[in-house]
Amino acid sequence: MIDDGIIAAIASGYVESAIGIIRVSGKNSIELLKKIFYPKKNTFEPYKIYHGFLKDSNQKIVDEVLVSVFKSPHSYTGEDSFEINCHGGLLIMQNVLDLVLKNGARLALPGEFTKRAFLNDKIDLLQANAIVNLIKAKTQKALDIAFGQLLKKNTTIIEELREKIIFLMAENEVLIDHPEEDLSDVDLNKRLLILNEITKLIQKLLKFSEKGKYFFEGVNVAIIGKPNVGKSSLLNELTGHNRAIVTDIPGTTTDIVSETLNLNGIPIKILDTAGIRKHSNKIEYLGIKKSHEAIDEADIIIAVFDSSRILDKNDEDILNIIKNKKNVLIVLNKSDLKRKLLLPLNIDPIEISCTKKTGINTLKSRLYNMLIEDYNESEVVSLNTSQIIALKSALKHAKKIKKAYIDSLDPALISIDLQQLADYIEQIIGKIENEDILDNVFKNFCVGK
């Protein structure tokens, strides 16, 4: 699977800047450098920066540059590599890259440098995900979590999982090797106890990966309610500026209005939806249709009611929409007026007044607490889709093994299932034999990384 050919890319991005960086890596990359780079000293020592000129085959100067050299295995990719710091003009960077490509390199694919780092055992897949998140982080909290994952500060759950599975595998091998003698001091109850612990750890890892998704991918929050209850006013108060048009005319919002809020490190995309009621025209019908779509896609729903008016049919429709939804916050707006609205007893509403600007911080606090329930920053991880699928498969497999123990199946058969369980957990860190799956892991990286 390892391609050690020379790859190159503009690592600083194809944008005009003061300095541009062209990254090159692969077997014989230092020999390539000697063909095009003319410093005062042509013997390259690692971890030093050399000043000189890049020249083409006709000895024409392409640029005056600084070059840093890295020798295998002590480089980002684990291979011989170098980086050219040139002037940051678009044409200069392209000329430098073309010069490298003409002398034996090929253009790197997105994420190929990091893929080589993984294949050369410089990083595991958890750290690869962390690198993506470092680049894409939108908040300081997301950046801190990504650094923790890169430095392997939050992989204790996975290590604990591996240890417990290895223990069961080793104990099962004793039963296979000595079928006539009961040399194991582990009884059925202890095996089942360990499997229960494995199941809980997998569930915990899935839960914390969901928290990681919030920090790195953000959360969709839909504000819903009948017309003229203050949805647009609430959007403006949450975001701190007048993003949505606010009038006394019901049905002003006919399309989804969105704005982003940084809520204690979590990027929140707030959607102000059209008021839900029996539509009066086609435009309003389309707006209400989009509101229902936003409700289905939202991670959290904020249902807004006018506390100064009695409950009506439109309010009841809203309550019916949210009754089977998991993450819902009920908000009573216009709390500065006399309250006339009566809600079912099992509802714990948040009273606010957009006019008086009260209760907004309480709403933000409730929203944040709903997102980070049972949250532990040191254990939050970011997993890609294939890793989450592997975890869910591991969860099902653990239950299958538990049944096999209870049914007293042959240890040789249980051994196969234990190995499969171990393989699923290994996929989280990096045991992937399918090249297509591996390519898919790194496709979301930018070129040059």
Where are these regions (language model features)?
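C-terminal-of-GTPase-core extension/linker across diverse P-loop GTPases
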Residues: 2-10, 14, 55, 140-259, ...
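Conserved beta-strand segments of alpha/beta enzyme cores
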Residues: 106, 267-269, 348
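Generic enzyme active-site microenvironment
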Residues: 270, 304, 331
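Glycine-rich, N-terminal phosphate-binding loop of Rossmann-like dinucleotide-binding domains
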Residues: 88, 238, 273, 305-308
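Short beta->alpha junction loops/turns
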Residues: 25-26, 89, 250, 307-308, ...
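Switch I (G2) and immediately adjacent beta-strands of P-loop GTPase domains
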Residues: 51-71, 251-279, 297-300
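A glycine-rich (often HGG/GG-containing) alpha/beta subdomain
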Residues: 1-144, 148, 152, 163, ...
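Inter-motif core of Ras-like GTPase G domains
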Residues: 284-308
